[in-house]
Structures are given as C-alpha cells and as structure tokens.
C-alpha cells in the first residue's frame, strides 16, 4: 500500500511538472538561439596556402595573414603565422580604430584584477559613486580623445557609456569567446560577453553584449544598462580592398534620488548601528529616472591604387572613405517636482527634459607608405551635427555643417619611433583643433621611454551653450569659450615591472556638468 501511494504521488508530481507541453514554435525558437550561440564552436578559420602559378605574382610574406598586410605600417608589425601546426595566443589579434594591433592577453596579473568591474577598466584616478555602475567622478583630467566636433556635454554620466575607442576589430585563427560575470550590490548582476570568429582567413565578425543591473544600498538607486556591439572586417585575397563595419547600440537607465535629506545626513554622521543599513535612510525624492539611448554606426572602405611585388622599396598609395553616425537621446523624467530645485517653468505640471543630439561625419582619406617618408595619412572631414531640446520651444535647435583637415605621420629613425597627428578646423563656429606628437625610444634591459606633447581646443558641449530645463532656475543660453588643453607627458615602461608615467596638464575654460 505504501509503495502504491509513493508511486501515485510521484506520478502526480510528474504530471504537475509537465502538465503543459512546450509549443512547437517555441521549441524551434529555442533551437535557433542554441544553434546561433554554438555556431562559433563549429567554425574553423584555417589559412590554406595560396595557389602558385603564373597568374598569381609572388609577394613578400605570402603565407602571413596580417590585418594591415597592405598598409606596411612599420609601427604595427604584429602578424599571424596561420599554420595549423603552430598557433599561439599571439595569433589572436585586436585591431583598434587607428589600426594599431595588439594580441589577446590571457595572463592573470594585478592589472587584470583592477579591471574586474562593470566598466572593464582600471578605475585609478576615478571616484565611484555608491552604487555599482552608477557614475565615476574623475580625479584627474589627463584623459583626452582626438576629436574636434562638439559633443552634447553631459560629462558626469560619460563613464556609463560604451565609448567608440573601447571596441575594435579582431583576427583569430580559431573561434574565441570571452565571458565576464560579477554580482553587484544588494541585488543584480554584471556581465560582458564577446564572441568572435574568422569565417574565412580574411573575414571576421565579433559580437558582444554588456548587461548590468544593481539595486544599490540606498533607496531608489537602481542602475541598469544594456549595450550591444558588433563589428566585422574583410580584406580581399590580394589585399587591395578592405572593409570595416561597426554597430553599437546602448540603453542606460538610472534612478535618481537627489541624495539624503537633512535628517538622514545627521543619522548617517551619528554612526548609530541602526543606520548601517542604508535603506533606512530617507532620500529627497523617489520618483525620478535618467534614460540614455545611444546608437553608433561606422562604415569604412579603402582600395590600394599603387602596389608592387616589393612592398619594402616601392611607395604604396591607398584611397578610402569613412562614414560615421552617432545619435544620442537623453531624457530626465520626474513624477512630481522637487522643491529643492526651485519652481517649475510656466505651463508645466511635472519635470521632463529631453535632449536629442546627432553627429554625422564623412572622411575622405589617403594613406601613403614608402621607405623615405614612412607611413602618412591625410584626410578631409565633413561634420554635420545637430542639437535639439525636443519638448521646449524657447530655444531653437542648432544645426551646423563644418569641415576639417588633418593627417598622421609615423616614421622610424633607427631605433626611435616617431608619431605625430593633427586636425585643424577650416569652417564652422564650434569645430575644434588638436596637435599631437610622440617619440618612443628603447633603453637598456627592455625598458622603453615614451615622451610627447598634445594640444587641443574643443567646444565644451551644446548643453553649456543652451539648456532649457523644466525647472526655471536651470535655464540658460550662453556663448561658451573653447576649452583648451596643453599637456606634456613622459612614460617609462617595462614588460615585467609595469609603467611609470608623469603628465603635466594646463586647462583653460574647463566646463563640467
């Protein structure tokens, strides 16, 4: 009797667990997702020896596959010897937007430990806010980017975003995947996934996703973001035609609470054990949210016009173009106004700020390499940018076209590497300029000394020029001055002992919001 009851209970439990069958369409959908994730495991990117004969001229490094094989870049000499019998970690390459190449690093070091966070970067010289992934306050103003177009100007939240230079292109002899996972404060997780494979020795794709959600220690402080990125690069068999494509979409949501109220500040400073639980502390409001949506697309193609069998003696000329579109949508919404920010503007019942920014760039460039001048690239760039406050009719939108010219020169003088770049605006009221120069000299015992200078002039951002908040006290229209930075830097590096750097920076008209 007991066995019959146990059998009956097991059957009943089994019927409850499988009382509803999974629909066929849902099974097929799950199967498609499973096959998509497993696809890189079955892809083999093996380099076959090129055919020989009179129809294919012999070239130097014929059996090597390099992301810049026709670029002849003396300062970027990493290459892949893609033979099945000899594959090492140095054959897995990461190519930056500037076509600098490094190999994938799988070592476990202290530097990797400090990068084990939601930003996947070392937070040295940054002060993080209380919640994981919320924002980082910079303690140093050393970081800069080679950009002359004006940005939207919300610098306080910039650390949450995936910036263009943080994602590059790949070349791998076998499929490569990278997984990051970490729990966050109170409740939530942070993850970063990258899958890349060479479908063909000259065709690569990479797809990555970064997700983050953290509840935080205080009330109404949830931080979350979802960032998807994709890149692909192709080079035809003779190395003349090259294509690069990059797509990046991101969505960031951050609850805002205005900080602790006066009573909670006193409770916090008292050190009472009761308030070690930060959720007991009251905040100024619990009804505001910041939302950011960003989309970025980059398409780049070039073609080698002049070439020869001997790439070390004959100049090579390459022509190309690059198109980029960057769209940002910033929104701040609040269910009820907070008296600490003042009164609302006329005819408004609750705060809602919406700023839209778009930047479109088109570059036409040429790359010349020769034993005499080294590597030189020149370009002319067309900027088309707009800034609009979607819900406000007080200030008109800003739309402007601007042009700039620039170039980059790389040359090796014996053991000394020299690199210089510049871009100068030739039209447009808000376009900036920059000049950069750097030398690198190997020293004794694998030590390397790097020194240089940089100068930059850039618009601080459209939000400093005009902004119409729902709060009447946060509305302005100005004519901001250009932000100017001058820096001199030096760095002593060693592959085992690390880096020691010194930078002195002088900044005029610095703006922060």
Q: Could you tell me what each predicted segment is?
A:
Residues 48, 147, 172-174, 291-334, ...:
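Exposed, low-structure sequence patches enriched in small/polar residues
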Residues 45-115:
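Sec-dependent signal peptide cleavage junction
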Residues 1-53, 374:
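Bacterial Sec-dependent N-terminal signal peptides
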Residues 189-211, 220-253:
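Transmembrane beta-barrel wall of Gram-negative outer-membrane proteins
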Residues 77, 90-94, 101, 182, ...:
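Outer-membrane beta-barrel proteins
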Residues 150-152, 163-169, 173-195, 216-217:
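Short strand-turn segments of transmembrane beta-barrel domains in outer membranes
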Residues 239-300, 328-338, 347, 355, ...:
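Flexible loop and strand-edge segments within Gram-negative outer membrane beta-barrel domains
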Residues 114-164, 171:
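Low-complexity, highly charged intrinsically disordered N-terminal segments
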């Amino acid at each position: 009797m007991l066995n019959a009851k146990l059998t009956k209970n097991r059957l009943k439990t089994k019927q409850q667990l499988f009382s509803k069958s999974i629909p066929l369409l849902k099974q097929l959908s799950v199967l498609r997702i499973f096959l998509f994730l497993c696809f890189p495991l079955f892809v083999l990117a093996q380099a076959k020896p090129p055919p020989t004969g009179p129809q294919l001229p012999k070239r130097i490094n014929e059996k090597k596959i390099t992301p810049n094989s026709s670029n002849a870049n003396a300062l970027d000499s990493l290459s892949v010897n893609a033979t099945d019998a000899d594959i090492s970690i140095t054959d897995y390459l990461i190519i930056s937007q500037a076509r600098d190449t490094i190999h994938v690093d799988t070592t476990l070091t202290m530097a990797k430990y400090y990068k084990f966070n939601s930003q996947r970067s070392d937070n040295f010289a940054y002060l993080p806010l209380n919640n994981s992934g919320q924002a980082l306050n910079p303690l140093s103003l050393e970081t800069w980017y080679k950009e002359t177009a004006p940005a939207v100007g919300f610098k306080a939240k910039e650390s949450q975003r995936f910036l263009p230079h943080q994602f590059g292109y790949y070349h791998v002899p076998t499929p490569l995947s990278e997984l990051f996972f970490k729990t966050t404060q109170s409740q939530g997780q942070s993850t970063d996934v990258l899958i890349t494979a060479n479908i063909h020795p000259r065709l690569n794709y990479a797809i990555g996703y970064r997700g983050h959600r953290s509840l935080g220690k205080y009330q109404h402080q949830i931080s979350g973001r979802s960032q998807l990125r994709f890149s692909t690069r192709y080079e035809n068999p003779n190395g003349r035609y090259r294509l690069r494509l990059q797509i990046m979409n991101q969505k960031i949501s951050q609850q805002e609470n205005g900080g602790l109220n006066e009573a909670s500040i006193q409770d916090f400073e008292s050190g009472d054990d009761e308030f070690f639980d930060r959720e007991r502390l009251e905040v100024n409001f619990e009804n505001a949210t910041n939302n950011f949506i960003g989309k970025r697309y980059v398409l780049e193609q070039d073609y080698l016009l002049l070439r020869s069998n001997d790439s070390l003696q004959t100049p090579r000329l390459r022509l190309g173009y690059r198109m980029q579109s960057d769209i940002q949508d910033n929104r701040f919404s609040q269910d009820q106004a907070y008296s600490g920010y003042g009164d609302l503007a006329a005819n408004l019942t609750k705060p809602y700020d919406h700023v839209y920014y778009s930047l479109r760039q088109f570059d036409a460039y040429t790359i010349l390499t020769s034993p005499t001048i080294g590597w030189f690239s020149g370009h002319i760039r067309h900027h088309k940018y707009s800034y609009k406050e979607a819900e406000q009719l007080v200030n008109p939108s800003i739309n402007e076209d601007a042009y700039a010219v620039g170039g980059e020169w790389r040359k090796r003088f014996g053991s000394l590497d020299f690199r210089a770049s510049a871009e100068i605006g030739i039209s447009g009221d808000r376009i900036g300029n920059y000049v950069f120069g750097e030398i690198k000299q190997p020293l004794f015992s694998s030590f390397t000394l790097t020194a240089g200078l940089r100068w930059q002039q850039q618009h601080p951002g459209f939000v400093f020029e005009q902004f119409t908040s729902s709060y009447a006290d946060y509305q302005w229209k100005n004519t901001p001055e250009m932000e100017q930075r001058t820096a001199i830097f030096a760095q002593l590096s060693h592959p085992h002992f690390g880096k020691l750097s010194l930078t002195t920076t002088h900044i005029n008209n610095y703006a922060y919001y």
